[in-house]
Amino acid sequence: MTDTSAPGDAGGFERRARQNQAERRANLETTYDFIICGAGSSGSVVARRLAENPACTVLLIEAGPDDEAESVLDPALWPANLGTDRDWGFQAEPNPHLDGRALSMSMGKGLGGGSSVNVMVWARGHRSDWDHFAAETGDPAWNYASVLDIYRRVENWQGQPDAKYRGTNGPVWVQPAKDPSLIAGALLDAAEALGVPRFDHPNGEMMEGVGGVAYADMLVREGRRHSLYRAYVRPIADYPNLTILTETVVRRVLFDGRRAIGVEIERAGSISPIKASAEVVISTGAINTPKLLMLSGVGDRDELARLGIPVVQHLPGVGRNLQDHVSFGCTWEYREPLAPRNSGSEATLYWKSRPDLTAPDLLFCQVEFPVPSERTALLGVPNHGWTMFAGLAQPHSRGRIRLKSADPSEMPVVDANMLSDPRDLEAARACVKLCREIGSSDAFRPFVSAERIPGTGRQIDDAFIRDAAVTYWHQCGTAKMGSDDMSVVDAKLAVHGIAGLRIADGSVLPRVTTGNTQAPCAIVGERAADLMRRQYRL
């Protein structure tokens, strides 16, 4: 391990951290103050903030491996993680709204979670997202103004100074795409020519109005991925009060009545309980979090009874409200090959499908290599080209997570249900139309020879949209915040009706945010940690 916050002592820190964690793992306690399930974009934040108090003992449990792999650390190699042991590899059910297609639903597995396998884009979400969360929870601490304060606190911004929106003293190294590709610059020029406003960065004024275009903000430091695990947990891996377990599965939460008292884990083939004297925090993502809740007896009583799981708390919203950004890629062939730079995704665009909208409902992420679906690949994939990963930022369709059985080793049933709402199909048509206008504009002519997918001259119909649809892997919403009957947690992220159990990950978001989701998940982690430190006077 290398403490990136103190490069001068890298060797000494590495030795201390490795020795410390080896000792912690070899001498596991039977009880910790706090147990955090999942070392992803939210769980890493919670673990760091709690462990900053030396009086707290913190156990951070991760199902996947460590992050010491070139496929993780080299920004250009992120696609190499998909379909490996660093990917949960979920598969959605066949969807009648996609002509029976069953989409792959990748999710990061390992230290850093999604922030160790994604394209490293830092996107805060739109003002309207956070104000919606405040309205849903009745708590102004979730509104845009409050969250902006947290963003400034956590960022170590490396771009042009902007004190109104950016912070420079936090743990998260955020930088503009360094030396971006000419094709990324062409996207900015093309969008601006079509009337889309251009901004210096995408995480300030651009996310307060109708949208815009900018070079992406990225979590890349000195040419290496700067995951949220590396930002928050890695620099404190030598703390004696922090234990990090990898390749350890949390099978269920343990209860005494309606109080969470620990977890049951499986590690190296052995199953054992570990107690939490204060709280258990679930941060396992929008597919695994509802799975873990239901396996533990928290969910819809009828569903649990069907599987023979004793009911601890009836919460019918567990697993409901599944949302994800859905994309419809269009691909162009290069005149001459252009090698991807950084992560291969350096420019981002948010816009609206209808003139009357006051916030963007479309999301465009440029990918500097071809990314077709398995269906649209049949149209012909160029050897050298780029794809506009054009999608719905605010989909109306909702899916669901269900248990297949009471066996923790079984994958859950993922009913993604994309494009089930007719409004999404209407927005998708506008999305693909704008995508093609941009890619076929004057700005791209020096670089592009032809549109290959869907193909020059082809009229866009609903069949193409259903064939092209793929997921951004931004699953959210399956344990949402709020006070209605379908809410799972309150504004403090505590599970309704349960003591000592909190959720901190993208599953608590009432709706998916506008843009990539790792930054909002970091905010969820910061909010959870703030609330816990206040409650326990840490």
Positions of predicted regions on the chain:
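N-terminal redox-cofactor-binding region of secreted/periplasmic oxidoreductases
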Residues: M1-L538
